[in-house]
Every structure is written in structure tokens, then in C-alpha cells.
């Protein structure tokens, strides 16, 4: 490898909304804020998280629902 062309790695902390703190190496050099991590992601925990998108679906059906019917 050529000397002097590679970025420097710094240890940063990635803070999750669940409170989990992860130390990682990064070239960005700033701390990160995560929405989900391995400790709280539904795939890894085995729990379902309900996302309320009913308002969007109702709004879409109200606008375009009659177009598909004959």
C-alpha cells in the first residue's frame, strides 16, 4: 500500500434509540445516531413492530380507489 493516501481510522460511538452504545472504527470521525441496532431490530429480537400507515392507505384509496373499479 502507498503511504499517505489512506484515510485515518478513528474510534467513534454509535448511539441507538434503545440506549445501546456501540464503539466502531470509522473514517468519518463523528459519532453516529442509529434508529435501530442488533439489540432492538425486530428481525433479531423476534418481535413484531406495528407501523401505523393506515392514514396513508386510506388517503390513497380515497384519491385513487375508484379508478380501478368498472
UniProtKB/Swiss-Prot annotation:
The record's GO molecular-function terms, alphabetically, read: metal ion binding; rRNA binding; structural constituent of ribosome
Give the multimer and partner information.
Answer: Part of the 50S ribosomal subunit.
Q: Which NCBIfam families match?
A: L31, PRK00019.1, PRK00528.1
Q: What does this protein do?
A: Binds the 23S rRNA.
Q: Identify this protein by name.
A: Large ribosomal subunit protein bL31
Which Gene3D superfamilies does the annotation name?
Ribosomal protein L31 (4.10.830.30)
Entry's Gene Ontology BP terms: translation
Q: Which family does it belong to?
A: Belongs to the bacterial ribosomal protein bL31 family. Type A subfamily.
Cofactor comment text: Binds 1 zinc ion per subunit.
Give residues annotated as binding Zn(2+): 16, 18, 37, 40
Report the HAMAP family cross-referenced here. Ribosomal_bL31_1 (MF_00501)
Needed co-factor(s): Zn(2+)
Cited Pfam families: Ribosomal_L31
Its gene is: rpmE
Q: Decide whether keyword Ribosomal protein is in the record.
A: yes
Name a GO CC annotation attached to this entry.
ribosome
| Keywords of the record | Metal-binding, Ribonucleoprotein, Ribosomal protein, RNA-binding, rRNA-binding, Zinc
Q: Which domain of life is it from?
A: Bacteria
The answer to whether keyword RNA-binding applies is yes
